[in-house]
Structures are given as C-alpha cells and as structure tokens.
Amino acid sequence: MMKIGALLPRSTFQPLLHHNFQQGMQAYLQYRQVPAELITAHIGFGTEPEKVLAEAEKMLLEQQVDVLVLYADQDAVQNIASLARSLNRLVLLVHNGAKYPYNWEPHPVVLSHTLNNTIQCRLTGQYAAGLLKDAAVCTSFYDGGYSHCHALTQSYMDNGGNIAYNFVSQYKVQEFNSTPLHDFLKANTHVQALLSLFNGDLAHCFLQQLQQQDIAKDLQVFASPMLLDETLPAVYGELRLPFRISGYVPWTSSIDNNANRLLKTQFLHSTGREANLAGMHGWDTALILEHIFNTADQHRFRAKDILAGLDGITFDSPRGPLRMDTATHHMLAPAWLVQANEVLEQEVTGRVDDTAKTWQEILNDKTIATATGWINTYLCA
C-alpha cells in the first residue's frame, strides 16, 4: 500500500477548491482500485511558512508518507523541499501555475503538476494581438498581482498589440465598480479588445456589469482561464453575454477524448456532481500517483529515481497528453482555445499541443527572472 500525504489550502475566492481537488483524487484512486492511504491536512492560505513546514514535517517524519502532495506555490515551499531532499521523498506540487518558476527550480525532489496558466495567458495574448491591435487591460488588485497578468499583456505587446488603458478593480464584489472602464470604452470606440483576468465572484461581476453596456456588442474579451470558468453562471447567476469571449484554458468539459469522458462519468458517479477544473486537477494528480505506485519496485519511492523514471512517460489525461519537462520538472499538457456563447458554454475552436515551446519562451525571457507579487498561492486568499 502507498501512503499519500496531501496538504490542502483554503480559498475564499473558490470555497470548494480543496474539496473538489481531493474528491478528484479520490474518484480516480477508487475507480482504479489503487491500494493507497490518503492522509490530508489543511494549511490555510499558505501564508504562514512555519505552519506549512510543521504540517509537512508531521507527514514526512511521523506519518512517513511515500509521496507528499502540496497545494502551494510560495517561495517558502523551498524549505519543505529541503526537508524532503534529506529524506529523498517526492514533493508533488500542485497549483494553477499563475506564477513564473522560482530561481531554485528545478529541484531534485520536486515535481510541479500545475494548470500551466502562464502558458495559456501567453498564448491568449498572442491570439488577441493577431485579431485586434488596441486593448484595455482589465483585472483586479488581486488577480493582477500574479505572473499570468504579465504573460497575457507582454505577449500581446510583443506581437504588435498596444495597451491603451488599464482598469484595476478592488478585490471585493461590494466595492467593484467598472464605470471608469465603461466610460473609457465609450470615449474610445476603436478600443474593442479587453485583456481580462478575474476569478470567482469578481469574474461574474465583471461580466455582468459589462453585458449591460450598449457598447458591449462591439467588444471582444480575451480571457484568463479562471474568467472562463464554466461554473460561474451556476454558482453566481445567469449571464447573457452580447460579446465574444475567448481564450486558452487548461481544460474544459467539452474536450472530446476518452480520458475526459471517463473523468466526467466517474466524477459524477463518485460525487453526484459534474466534473470541474479542480476536480480534474485532482484526478490528473492521482493519475501520476498511480504510475508511481505501479513502478514502486523500480524506485522504492526514492524521489530522484521517480523523477528519472518519468522521463519519456506520457499520461492519457483529460487535458490531452501530459508529460514532464525534464529540464524543469514541470508537467506540461496541451492548451485549449475556447469560445464561449452568451451563457458561457464553451466550444473548443483550437488547441496547441506543443506547449513546451511556449514554456521555453517563458524560461528564456530574461525580463521576468525576478518578479514581485502576492506571496500566497493563486486563488488561496
């Protein structure tokens, strides 16, 4: 039997984040009948490094887990990685991938299994620049504090786009007021592209206020993955969008492959609910954990041997082929271009299979070697 430790976060933006992620893991492990014990603990927003380290120490030293799943992307994760290195135990980092890699990566015992948001935002910026050359950037004080904002806007400008206006909202719905943005768009009708990054209730509020404007029908919204969250209408209320909204995402329920159909069937069977992004991420994580269990005779749960054994392995993920980039120990999957209709239902209109090329562009961009921003994991605030 494999013993899995999972340190899970809290999120006010996405209250069910940890729950959905855990249910996705459990749904896959149960479906595949993987003999595994899952031990969980909660680390809040992950902004207290001592607390997170203490929970990791308990799992690695006292409970002696074979693999530690850690939902976090703070720089302080390095302290846990150092502990795991001394024990030669694998840390499987999971998060949205909204930040650029740290300068201590790659780490010899860390595998980063993210949703690759910086890759998708970079691709969306390029896509937007190919259609419209003048844009307004729309984000919140919170969402704009992560690298995915730079990935979206910089790639737009690098491909000939001009940013004519920046709208940065407060991060509470009660204080959300997009009137300055609407006034700008009415006075500058040549600006029809909106590079937009919001999540949760702010995403819904942004779309709801925008759809009520007379100018809305002339606009095109190029969205971050969390703004294209399919669950927004069900959670926060119906939308009737008169404008086109599109962008690259890590996953959408309409992906037509066998692995995604299996995810949707088994998640519904296990939970009684439709599959969602966090649930898919948990399912995907368990896919990797199953491989680690099945190859245990070769590596005996030694982290460095596990990582060496992943070289050249392709997983059949609901997202498409999932592989490790050996140079950085980051898992990479295709990016899906979607266009949403008036009620935010999504249609896949394109895909980029070779996201390793975009990932390498990010790594090669020397202007982003040092980045500032929020210390907590994206969505975990």
Where are these regions (language model features)?
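Extracytoplasmic ligand/sensor domains, especially the bilobed periplasmic-binding protein
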Residues: 67-161, 220, 230-236
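Solvent-exposed, acidic/polar segments of extracytosolic/periplasmic ligand-binding ectodomains
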Residues: 318-381
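Short beta-strand elements in bilobed, periplasmic/extracellular small-molecule ligand-binding domains
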Residues: 31-47, 108-109, 157-178, 193
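Short beta-strand segments enriched in small/hydrophobic residues
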Residues: 1-20, 29-33, 133-139
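Short, charged, surface-exposed loops that flank catalytic or proteolytic processing sites
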Residues: 294-309
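Periplasmic-binding protein-like
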Residues: 61-73, 92-94, 136-139, 189-206, ...
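Extracellular/periplasmic periplasmic-binding protein-like sensory domains
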Residues: 210-283, 296-297
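Beta-alpha junction/loop-to-helix N-cap segments that form part of ligand/metal-binding clefts
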Residues: 20-21, 31, 35-99
